[in-house]
Design a protein with these regions (language model features):
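Conserved beta-strand hairpin/beta-sheet module of binuclear metal-dependent hydrolase folds
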Residues: 12-71, 179-190, 195
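Residue-level marker for buried hydrophobic side chains located in beta-strands
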Residues: 50-52, 80, 103, 186-188, ...
Length: 320
C-alpha cells in the first residue's frame, strides 16, 4: 500500500519512461524513479538475456513490453539483483512468476528477499527534500520471494551474463553488488553511487545528470559506502548505469567519480544522522542491530507538512 502511495504522490512525469542504450547489448529503462537494465543482444533467444533489478511497483507491464520489443517471446535466463530495496523489487514477484526464472542476489542480501529480515529503518533527517522526508513510508520488508531466490556464485561470475563479474559494493545495504564487464568498461552500479540527487523530488523529476553518493536516507554504513565508491572509481569505467539517474560515460563521468571517491566525506556523507554516528550491523541472518534514531523536531514538522501536501496532490491526481 505504501509503495502504491509513493507512486501516486509523484507527479505524472515520473510515470514516464526513457530507454537509453548503455552498450549494444545493454538497455537502461527508467521505471518511474528507478532504472532496470535488459542485458542481451537484441533478438536474443529464449533464456539468453537477463534482467537486472525489477523496478518500482506498477511497472510490470512496461518492463515486459520493452522485453517483448527487444527480445520477442524469449524469456530471460534469470533476474539478478543489485540489492533488494523496495524500489528495486517492486515488480520482482510478478516478473519472476510470469517468466519462471530464478532470482540471484548476494548472500548477505538473501535474508531480505526470503522473509527472514527487514531492512534497517531509513533516516529521514539526512539529505533534505521530499524523497528523504517521505522515507519512513517506504516498505522495508521483510520481502519473501521464496525458493526462486538463490545466491550469486562465489566465483564472481554472473548467471546468464558471460563476460561479466559481480563486485560486492556494500554500504547502501549489506549485500549490495555492482556488475562489471572489463572487456568494454561497462559498469552497472546499482545504488553504490547514483547520477541524480535522489533525496530531492525536484532532482528526481528533472533527472539532472550529476554524480552523487548513494541515497542518504537508505544508506546504513557510510565507511563501507566510501570503500565501495573508491573500488568502482578504481575500475575507470567507460560507462556507468546507476539505479537512479541517467547513464553517464566518458572522461567527464570518470572525473566526477574520481572526485566523489576523493572527497566522499564532504560530498556524500551527511554532517549528522542515524547511520553517520554508527552503522547498522548485519550478517547472513539479516539486520542484527541499528543505532538509535536522531530526533530533529523542525525536520519532523516539515516532513509532516510535506507528507500532507503530497497526499493532497496524490488525491487530486487520482480524481483526474
Amino acid at each position: 500500500m505504501a509503495t502504491e502511495m509513493l507512486t501516486d504522490l509523484l507527479p505524472q512525469v515520473t510515470r514516464g519512461d526513457a530507454e537509453t542504450a548503455v552498450a549494444h547489448d545493454v538497455l537502461c529503462l527508467r521505471t518511474g524513479i528507478v532504472n532496470v537494465l535488459l542485458v542481451g543482444e537484441p533478438g536474443a533467444g529464449d533464456r539468453e538475456w537477463v534482467l537486472v533489478d525489477a523496478g518500482i511497483y506498477g511497472f510490470t507491464h512496461r518492463i515486459m513490453h520493452e522485453a517483448q520489443e527487444r527480445f520477442g517471446d524469449s524469456r530471460p535466463a534469470c533476474i539478478v539483483m543489485t540489492h533488494g530495496h523496495f524500489d528495486h523489487v517492486g515488480c520482482l514477484r510478478e516478473l519472476s512468476e510470469a517468466w519462471g526464472v530464478p532470482i540471484y542476489a548476494h548472500r548477505l542480501e538473501l535474508p531480505y528477499l526470503t522473509g527472514r529480515s527487514a531492512y534497517p529503518p531509513p533516516d529521514p533527517t539526512v539529505g533534505g527534500g521530499l524523497m528523504a522526508l517521505s522515507s519512513p513510508l517506504y516498505p522495508r520488508g521483510p520481502f519473501d520471494y521464496g525458493e526462486r531466490v538463490r545466491p550469486l556464485p562465489d566465483d564472481g561470475s554472473v548467471p546468464g551474463m558471460p563476460g561479466w563479474q559481480w563486485i560486492h559494493t556494500p554500504g547502501h545495504c549489506p549485500g549490495h553488488v555492482s556488475f562489471w564487464r572489463p572487456d568494454d568498461g561497462v559498469l552497472i552500479v546499482g545504488d553504490a553511487f547514483v547520477t541524480t540527487k535522489q533525496e530531492s523530488l525536484l532532482a528526481v523529476l528533472e533527472q539532472r545528470p550529476e554524480i552523487h553518493g548513494p541515497p542518504m536516507y537508505y544508506t546504513q554504513d557510510w565507511d563501507a559506502a566510501r570503500r565501495s565508491v573508491q573500488a568502482l572509481a578504481d575500475l575507470q569505467p567507460e560507462v556507468a548505469a546507476t539505479g537512479h539517474g541517467p547513464p553517464l560515460r566518458g572522461a567527464v563521468m570518470r572525473a566526477g567519480l574520481d572526485l566523489l571517491a576523493r572527497d566522499f566525506e564532504t560530498l556524500a556523507v551527511p554532517r549528522d544522522g542515524r547511520y553517520v554516528r554508527a552503522p547498522a550491523i548485519a550478517d547472513e541472518r539479516g539486520t542484527v542491530s541499528v543505532p538509535p534514531p536522531v530526533h530533529n523536531r523542525a525536520l519532523l514538522i516539515g516532513g509532516v507538512a510535506a507528507l500532507a501536501l503530497g497526499i493532497i496532490v496524490g488525491a487530486r491526481m487520482r480524481r483526474r
